[in-house]
């Protein structure tokens, strides 16, 4: 899909950010060659220093944006400590960007269990074997742990580790950006003071 084949109409007239995001993500799924749901996730440590990494968005609705991770990882620890995070999607083929930020909540056990069961068996084993974000002696040590958990769960279902679950960012700000000539880009931001509040929309200078 080219930039000339996108949703008709002026996106800056939209009044519903989740609907607009769904439209943009759908067009990215038709245009981006790899992982259109990839998103930069920013967190802050206890000293106020930011960290950012790519994760995969695994769901969204009017309640927020969901991804899954090891809660003992750097991002897991920082989110549990600060209870806030930010995301940035950039779809290069469409020359579009979406930024959002807000408080974070943990998904329900039922949600986490349901998603965990959809993962490839090797990925479920990996959730047990990987001590994410901690020093690793060698590749062999990781492969040994994978072999041990593969043997342990050779028969039957692989349970979800207690330290592996999902987070939901409940945005209080969502910004949509579209590239235009001469850096005179189109940019709108939806804001609300609380995740349960009504949205206000502001058009921003590029």
From Swiss-Prot:
<feature type="binding site">
    <location>
        <position position="187"/>
    </location>
    <ligand>
        <name>FMN</name>
    </ligand>
</feature>
<dbReference type="InterPro" id="IPR012349">
    <property type="entry name" value="Split_barrel_FMN-bd"/>
</dbReference>
<feature type="binding site">
    <location>
        <position position="58"/>
    </location>
    <ligand>
        <name>substrate</name>
    </ligand>
</feature>
<feature type="binding site">
    <location>
        <begin position="183"/>
        <end position="185"/>
    </location>
    <ligand>
        <name>substrate</name>
    </ligand>
</feature>
<feature type="binding site">
    <location>
        <position position="115"/>
    </location>
    <ligand>
        <name>substrate</name>
    </ligand>
</feature>
<feature type="binding site">
    <location>
        <position position="119"/>
    </location>
    <ligand>
        <name>substrate</name>
    </ligand>
</feature>
<dbReference type="GO" id="GO:0010181">
    <property type="term" value="F:FMN binding"/>
</dbReference>
<dbReference type="Pfam" id="PF10590">
    <property type="entry name" value="PNP_phzG_C"/>
</dbReference>
<dbReference type="InterPro" id="IPR019576">
    <property type="entry name" value="Pyridoxamine_oxidase_dimer_C"/>
</dbReference>
<dbReference type="InterPro" id="IPR011576">
    <property type="entry name" value="Pyridox_Oxase_N"/>
</dbReference>
<comment type="similarity">
    <text>Belongs to the pyridoxamine 5'-phosphate oxidase family.</text>
</comment>
<feature type="binding site">
    <location>
        <position position="97"/>
    </location>
    <ligand>
        <name>FMN</name>
    </ligand>
</feature>
<feature type="binding site">
    <location>
        <position position="75"/>
    </location>
    <ligand>
        <name>FMN</name>
    </ligand>
</feature>
<feature type="binding site">
    <location>
        <begin position="68"/>
        <end position="69"/>
    </location>
    <ligand>
        <name>FMN</name>
    </ligand>
</feature>
<comment type="function">
    <text>Catalyzes the oxidation of either pyridoxine 5'-phosphate (PNP) or pyridoxamine 5'-phosphate (PMP) into pyridoxal 5'-phosphate (PLP).</text>
</comment>
<keyword id="KW-0664">Pyridoxine biosynthesis</keyword>
<comment type="pathway">
    <text>Cofactor metabolism; pyridoxal 5'-phosphate salvage; pyridoxal 5'-phosphate from pyridoxamine 5'-phosphate: step 1/1.</text>
</comment>
<dbReference type="Pfam" id="PF01243">
    <property type="entry name" value="PNPOx_N"/>
</dbReference>
<keyword id="KW-0288">FMN</keyword>
<comment type="subunit">
    <text>Homodimer.</text>
</comment>
<feature type="binding site">
    <location>
        <begin position="53"/>
        <end position="58"/>
    </location>
    <ligand>
        <name>FMN</name>
    </ligand>
</feature>
<comment type="pathway">
    <text>Cofactor metabolism; pyridoxal 5'-phosphate salvage; pyridoxal 5'-phosphate from pyridoxine 5'-phosphate: step 1/1.</text>
</comment>
<dbReference type="InterPro" id="IPR000659">
    <property type="entry name" value="Pyridox_Oxase"/>
</dbReference>
<protein>
    <recommendedName>
        <fullName>Pyridoxine/pyridoxamine 5'-phosphate oxidase</fullName>
        <ecNumber>1.4.3.5</ecNumber>
    </recommendedName>
</protein>
<dbReference type="GO" id="GO:0008615">
    <property type="term" value="P:pyridoxine biosynthetic process"/>
</dbReference>
<feature type="binding site">
    <location>
        <position position="177"/>
    </location>
    <ligand>
        <name>FMN</name>
    </ligand>
</feature>
<keyword id="KW-0285">Flavoprotein</keyword>
<feature type="binding site">
    <location>
        <begin position="132"/>
        <end position="133"/>
    </location>
    <ligand>
        <name>FMN</name>
    </ligand>
</feature>
<dbReference type="GO" id="GO:0004733">
    <property type="term" value="F:pyridoxamine phosphate oxidase activity"/>
</dbReference>
<keyword id="KW-0560">Oxidoreductase</keyword>
<feature type="binding site">
    <location>
        <position position="123"/>
    </location>
    <ligand>
        <name>substrate</name>
    </ligand>
</feature>
């Amino acid at each position: 899909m080219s930039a000339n084949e996108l949703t008709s109409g002026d996106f800056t007239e939209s009044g519903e950010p989740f609907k607009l995001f769904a439209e943009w993500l759908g067009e990215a799924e038709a245009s981006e060659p790899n992982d259109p749901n990839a998103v930069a996730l920013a967190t802050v440590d206890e000293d106020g220093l930011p960290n950012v990494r790519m994760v995969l968005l695994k769901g969204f609705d009017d309640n927020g944006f969901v991804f899954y991770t090891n809660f003992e990882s750097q991002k897991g620890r920082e989110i549990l400590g600060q209870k806030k995070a930010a995301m940035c999607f950039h779809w290069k083929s469409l020359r579009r960007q979406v930024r959002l930020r807000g408080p974070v909540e943990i998904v329900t056990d039922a949600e986490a269990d349901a998603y965990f069961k959809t993962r490839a068996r090797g990925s479920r084993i990996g959730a047990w074997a990987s001590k994410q974000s901690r020093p690793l002696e060698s590749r062999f040590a990781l492969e040994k742990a994978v072999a041990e958990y593969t043997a342990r769960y050779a028969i039957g279902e692989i349970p979800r580790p207690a330290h592996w679950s999902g987070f939901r960012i409940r945005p209080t700000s969502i910004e949509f950006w579209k590239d235009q000539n001469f850096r005179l880009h189109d940019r709108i931001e939806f804001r609300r003071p609380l995740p349960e509040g009504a949205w206000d929309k502001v058009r921003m200078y590029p």
